[in-house]
Amino acid sequence: LLKQRAQEIINIEEKIREDLSHSDDMLMGTITIGSGETCVLSGVAKLAASFRKENPKVMFEVCSGIADDIKDKIENGTVDIGLLKEPVDISKYEFVRLGQKEKWGVIMRKDCPLAEKEYITPKDLAGQPLIFAKRESVRNEIENWFGDCCDNIKIVASCDLIYNTESLVKGGVGLALCIDSDMYYDDLCFKPLSPMLETGTVIVWRKNRTVSPSVNSFIKHIKKCLECIA
């Protein structure tokens, strides 16, 4: 733990040195974005690319992790901006909500009997071995979707990273409820839920904290671009 904290302090010191090195007419330094596995990151990547056209000396670093890890890193200053999937507590943060929604569904093996269905309903999953996300707020959202079938949920594993989740499905552990990622093994398939369940994403940064000129300028760029497409 002490080694981890020491490394965090070193990373923060490096970011401060980069931030102080910028000139008045040229933004410099590194903007660190924390993100889980989400298709929404591709949209943020386009914002980063358009920002760099005007500010070519700014670099971006993407730090992958689950929501709790990203929030911790925002708190300790090693991540500037986070992409968090809802539902999530954002009371400590300034934020902008992205318009793009991601659909929930079930990842299963292609030899599963349910693979022949176009959509998956709560009754289809009653009594089936299921793989859930670890985050309690997300699990509550899924359990609400089950409605009257909630008592028949059979959770056999929990996982947060899509690659590891797919490995569990491929190995025959169970069916995984997750967001569509378009990244599957050839012998797996994704079936959307019915009724439909969608998840939004927010871009967050710490309230009442001074950020570097580069981060501040990028936040303004994000807001301006989102206003143009609203």
For the regions a protein language model found, what residue spans apply to each?
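A late-sequence structural motif
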Residues: 43, 191-230
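Basic, amphipathic "hinge/linker" alpha-helix immediately C-terminal to the N-terminal HTH DNA-binding motif
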Residues: 1-12
